[in-house]
Amino acid sequence: MNQWMELADRVLAGAEVTDEEALSILHCPDEDILLLMHGAFHIRKHFYGKKVKLNMIMNAKSGLCPENCGYCSQSAISKAPIESYRMVNKETLLEGAKRAHDLNIGTYCIVASGRGPSNREVDQVVDAVQEIKETYGLKICACLGLLKPEQAKRLKDAGVDRYNHNLNTSQRNHSNITTSHTYDDRVNTVEIAKESGLSPCSGAIIGMKETKQDVIDIAKSLKALDADSIPVNFLHAIDGTPLEGVNELNPLYCLKVLALFRFINPSKEIRISGGREVNLRTLQPLGLYAANSIFVGDYLTTAGQEETEDHKMLSDLGFEVESVEEMKASLSAKS
């Protein structure tokens, strides 16, 4: 038995990954990558079998953000030529939900730029979500920025299932990425979502000049936060942002990162998110031996892979898509 299978068995028995073991995952020799992914899949299969959860993003409000996040094309300091618009209307949100349903995508993610939502924007999301739930029954994830307790309660009461607010990087590295809000602001929003009964979703962006220890720290911080769903983004450096031209990643390292997140957060939904196409490239399929969830279609301001290609990839791997009906049954069992 190789060392990664031994570690996987210890994790399944309840052991926690030490920093030394975590570093050994990130330093795994490239020629041993299949052994590492075998260990990660041993854990993934225990909790999720061969099922893959599909998610789709609706960019409900673009640009116009006062924050100074260095990776983001929508920030106040970005010079990237993106389309900016205020919150889309209800019909547009419903059209996106229909498209997700028709493509057998179980989770519909409503994302809005900005520091946090106005009460009017929450009203708009609430109004649309109620009809989406009645018509399509999709799992709804909202990502609207820093959240107030009363806003979280309104979203939960309307039928929103999950709230996403990423920690993005380690506490130590946070001020290198943004200074317009604190790391604790982000943690607080996830806690507010949890306290309201929303399923907490929080993840990371890898490739922002962080150290390997930073990667380990963010994976362990998300474990401590008890995020149900963990999106792992890989930086897609956009021209016009402070991180323009940064390209520190390669496909094999990205696989090691995904394996690390699975070993540290064994039972959680690990989602391969933004930047997978440009960073994992031809090794995208291998990522699903650690992760059990992906975004399908376009991201916020960057293009994704064609939906048909994603379905083909999953079929070729022998994995099974969690259908909309299975997702509905799962939600009913939890309620």
Curated annotation (Swiss-Prot):
GO terms for MF:
2 iron, 2 sulfur cluster binding; 4 iron, 4 sulfur cluster binding; biotin synthase activity; iron ion binding
- The answer to whether the entry has keyword Isomerase is no
Q: Does the keyword Lipid biosynthesis apply?
A: no
Q: What is its EC number?
A: 2.8.1.6
**What reactions does this protein catalyze?**
(4R,5S)-dethiobiotin + (sulfur carrier)-SH + 2 reduced [2Fe-2S]-[ferredoxin] + 2 S-adenosyl-L-methionine = (sulfur carrier)-H + biotin + 2 5'-deoxyadenosine + 2 L-methionine + 2 oxidized [2Fe-2S]-[ferredoxin]
Q: In which pathway is this protein known to take part?
A: Cofactor biosynthesis; biotin biosynthesis; biotin from 7,8-diaminononanoate: step 2/2
Query: Where does the Radical SAM core domain lie?
Result: 47-276
EC main class here is: transferase
- Binding residues for [4Fe-4S] cluster, per the UniProt record? 65, 69, 72
Q: Which UniProt keywords apply?
A: 2Fe-2S, 4Fe-4S, Biotin biosynthesis, Iron, Iron-sulfur, Metal-binding, S-adenosyl-L-methionine, Transferase
CC cofactor note: Binds 1 [4Fe-4S] cluster. The cluster is coordinated with 3 cysteines and an exchangeable S-adenosyl-L-methionine. Binds 1 [2Fe-2S] cluster. The cluster is coordinated with 3 cysteines and 1 arginine.
Which GO terms fall under biological process for this protein? biotin biosynthetic process
**Pfam families reported for this sequence:** BATS, Radical_SAM
The UniProt entry, under InterPro entries, shows: Aldolase_TIM, BATS_dom, Biotin_synth/BioAB, Biotin_synthase, Elp3/MiaA/NifB-like_rSAM, rSAM
**Which pairs of Cys residues are joined through disulfide bonds in the record?**
none
The UniProt record gives the binding positions of [2Fe-2S] cluster as: 109, 141, 201, 271
Q: Which cofactor does it need?
A: [4Fe-4S] cluster; [2Fe-2S] cluster
Please state which protein family the record places this protein in.
Belongs to the radical SAM superfamily. Biotin synthase family.
Known role: Catalyzes the conversion of dethiobiotin (DTB) to biotin by the insertion of a sulfur atom into dethiobiotin via a radical-based mechanism.
Quaternary structure, per UniProt, is: Homodimer.
Q: Tell me the protein's name.
A: Biotin synthase
Recorded source organism is: Bacillus subtilis (strain 168)
Biological classification of the source = Bacteria, Bacillati, Bacillota, Bacilli, Bacillales
Q: Which gene encodes it?
A: bioB
